[in-house]
Amino acid sequence: MMPFYPVGSADLDVPPNLIGRGTGVCVSAYTHTEEGYDIEEMEAQWAQTYRLINKIRHNKDQLARYETLGLEDAEVVAVAYGANARTVKTGVLEARRRGVRAGFVRLITLWPFPDELFARDVPYVVCELNYDGQLVREVMRSAPDGKKVRFMGKSAELNTVAEVAAGLEGVARTGRIPELPYIWTEVR
């Protein structure tokens, strides 16, 4: 049987693609040997997982996808992903129209996380479609001062443009998100 990648190869980053006509490859979720047989031994599981994790880490720049706006002069940066990102971006544009130097980061992929986007020492406002704050923890971990990261969580509906603009304006002026109905600002 043809191995999944050269046996004993030091280059374990990208095994050749064997899927296609005439290859006889069975695709499954099980960890497998170099020959393609399912295994349960921890050492082989670890080696396979290690290879995949390192493959992602070494190619982080190609895999992490995001969109940015106005980061060059930003005094406060809004962060969002998914369905919420569109209204947050419009809220950033509204805040800029009001004189707040607001920036925007839309994460398209969440892993690998683009830590380098959060290297600036400015407040970050993470707008999420939940009350728990899942993404905010990653931003807190990546930012130089996690205490400058603010959370605007909302459940059952998207943040409105007015809420985002008011939140960014509040953080830029006072360091706090103003009291807004249905907005959760504590990370639990």
Name the predicted role of every residue range.
Residues M1-R188:
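Flexible, low-complexity linker and terminal segments
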